[in-house]
Amino acid sequence: MGLDHRLVSSKRGTVIEWRKANQIHGWFDHQLGGVKNITRYPVKIKQLEFLLDDCIRVKEDLIAGGMKNFEQVTESGIKDGEHYEKKEMVPMFVNVTLAKELLPPTPGFFFGGYEFDEWYLKQIDETIEKLMEILSTKQKGERFYYDAWW
């Protein structure tokens, strides 16, 4: 359950699969004028190049700004009739202005976290790696499509 999404090639089948990478889904949602559940959308090569560029810019900016530990509620509930919260120090990126502009976390039902943390960067890293491979090995007449289900 949650956000699953992918990029599909007309020649190679599924070339990227994401799980709860809501910032990437939000990017496609914005670029494609809205994305409906279980609907396939054509994606232009130029759009994939723009996504790659945005991912690289955000990654470089996050790394340049560094990380800092922030207190975050990791668990809450009722115990012995009293409300409680468990808090932990969690490393998060400090300079997130560009990330908020280009690849902001996108809310949705079970879409994953909204923090600018190591998981956020890992999803961007994986997207960069896959897009570089896809774009460098593009085949003649190959078309790409994006779909998501949640």
Region annotations inferred by a language model:
Residues 1-150:
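Acidic (Asp/Glu-rich) sequence patches and key acidic residues
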